[in-house]
Amino acid sequence: MLTNLRIFAMSHQTIPSVCINNICCYKIRASLKRLKPHVPLGRNCSSLPGLIGNDIKSLHSIINPPIAKIRNIGIMAHIDAGKTTTTERILYYSGYTRSLGDVDDGDTVTDFMAQERERGITIQSAAVTFDWKGYRVNLIDTPGHVDFTLEVERCLRVLDGAVAVFDASAGVEAQTLTVWRQADKHNIPRICFLNKMDKTGASFKYAVESIREKLKAKPLLLQLPIGEAKTFKGVVDVVTKEKLLWNCNSNDGKDFERKPLLEMNDPELLKETTEARNALIEQVADLDDEFADLVLEEFSENFDLLPAEKLQTAIHRVTLAQTAVPVLCGSALKNKGIQPLLDAVTMYLPSPEECNCEFLQWYKDDLCALAFKVLHDKQRGPLVFMRIYSGTIKPQLAIHNINGNCTERISRLLLPFADQHVEIPSLTAGNIALTVGLKHTATGDTIVSSKSSALAAARRAEREGEKKHRQNSEAERLVLAGVEIPEPVFFCTIEPPSVSKQPDLEHALKCLQREDPSLKVRLDPDSGQTVLCGMGELHIEIIHDRIKREYGLEAYLGPLQVAYRETILNSVRATDTLDRTLGDKRHLVTVEVEARPTETTSVMPVIEYAESIHEGLLKVSQEAIENGIYSACLQGPLLGSPIQDVAITLHSLTIHPGTSTTMISACVSRCVQKALKKADKQVLEPLMNLEVTVARDYLSPVLADLAQRRGNIQEIQTRQDNKVVIGFVPLAEIMGYSTVLRTLTSGSATFALELSTNQAMNPQDQNTLLNRRSGLT
């Protein structure tokens, strides 16, 4: 059963026998005895969690540790802050790899896609399971590039805690703000790691201040650096008043010593640490009443007598309450500060049972899991990553997919180790599992044990909602909590190398869409071409590359275009009648609709009904009407772009007996399109938040270039020796900007983009765009 275990290098001779009742466990033990050393991807990997060294614990404790000992964490940050390098060091010190991976060398564990290894960036979030000092840690490394924001959203949805990694020389950067807001949305406790303390320009004080000012967070300084930039050699543990120094002659950072600070050896450092500890105690006491009472009653006269364990427990409570964030520092590349970071993860971040998942009360002890990622494996088929919130998952278990309203069977259950997977007999609540055999499950789907279990949960949620005067829709949302998919901002056509390869291209795109819901694929009704819609230039480029590498198709991409949207400016009415006879059956529909602009932003049309219609409307007819409205709003009258910020009201509807739902949809769609054409129309263009970090000498040419791109500069900040330009710029004007910026600044500047909103174009720019699209200019 455990053929995949052969990837782990172990000595089978020293594994003692274990009494295991389950027949599956006997198979696992037998497989362990047959293991042969094998090195995947040129790396030395250690054993399955719990099989550290020559000892093997009970199999249940290896696979399913106590829930209090589980930590589901993610690593999040701005691009190039050092997330993947930090992850590699974590895996190495936890005993899960036997050599240090390097992003520049392309041999990291969590960057397992070919494009990731080549580009040195993380595209997909890879889940890794390892042990640290008796704790089970499920860790997800996430991308920092704005084009892959969905990957961050996807993993944050299933995490209990997170490590935010910062470049100590840059502090809070643009994408850091984005992922921090996402973590706020999901109420995820965080700890901060100030990385790259060895880098020229690194400033602990500046980085901490940027967390306080830009993130509006209260930093708890648990460590102080010993030196900065080239002089950085270790950290001081403020809580225990100890210094941690790494051996300069050690190549891997495992060799470090922890010494108590003494007056005779480090008087200045001891004084600074004592002041920092006293400030920390006061700060935590202000945030935690229980700790404040303890300090006032027993340690008010001398904070030095306060035990470190009491302070650590209080910091844990404050972190869970999200009233402050612990701050640590180090250098992942130089192998300093990672072991204390791991200690902080187990000490301060929550276990699954400490997280308040309100929807769990509807399921009690039944299975409830969320599919948060889908991958396609050529041998195994679809691989679905799941976060188990309650119950147990086993191989051959039949499960019910609430979103897809279908029942499937899990054929195999795996423990994820980046792109290496180990087969296991069961997984319980709090864990992250990898399942094989689910062919219809997609990202964001809620998985339960059966349809009856889902109905029972819905009834409990509805009853509770009535007690709290909630709408049914909110109770339903609690049961079907999923992953929010952002709207794409770029699109281009894609064609196969030949007509005979069209089915292969469609299969590849279908698989990629299941893996990445932010990728949208549609058929252009006018040209019949397949259109790819994505989150950015890099996103589309990566998809194109994957089609070539993974599916062997040399597909051709059309020019990249901006995904504009359209809206209307006034209220209009329209009527339409569809009268058609097919065979001996007459289909007759008469519709009157009103289209008007909405006051709030709404990507999907808001659908309303006149009272006289809604009362007697059949459900199938209502679905047909809404399908017709949605279809009409997919293509606006100006550019053929989707319509947004519009409300459609159905004022009258006459349906002849025997009329099919297809004819109802067609009539409603045609009527809505007629109304949209009559209205005053407006093109909306994507407006991006832009942050450019540039040396002072190159500031003027950068500002001049942005002015030509219709940029709106909000402010110019000073960051160390650089200037940071913050503003807005239309997406259409920023295509290919990286090449221009490199030329203007001799390659010294960096920039970050994030979608802000869709703004109305001015009449002149709109006319220019329409003329260009129609071929007049």
From Swiss-Prot:
Residues that bind GTP: 77-84, 141-145, 195-198
UniProt entry tagged with the keyword Nucleus: no
Main EC class the enzyme belongs to: hydrolase
Reactions catalysed according to its record: GTP + H2O = GDP + phosphate + H(+)
GO cellular component, one term: mitochondrion
EC number: 3.6.5.-
Alphabetical GO biological process terms: mitochondrial translation; ribosome disassembly
Coiled coil: none
UniProt keyword annotations, A-Z: GTP-binding, Hydrolase, Mitochondrion, Nucleotide-binding, Protein biosynthesis
UniProt key word Manganese: no
InterPro entries: EF-G-like_DII, EFG2, EFG_II, EFG_III, EFG_III/V, EFG_V, EFG_V-like, G_TR_CS
Role, per record: Mitochondrial GTPase that mediates the disassembly of ribosomes from messenger RNA at the termination of mitochondrial protein biosynthesis. Acts in collaboration with MRRF. GTP hydrolysis follows the ribosome disassembly and probably occurs on the ribosome large subunit. Not involved in the GTP-dependent ribosomal translocation step during translation elongation.
Remarks, miscellaneous: This protein may be expected to contain an N-terminal transit peptide but none has been predicted.
Protein's name in the database: Ribosome-releasing factor 2, mitochondrial
Organism: Pongo abelii
Gene symbol of the encoding locus: GFM2
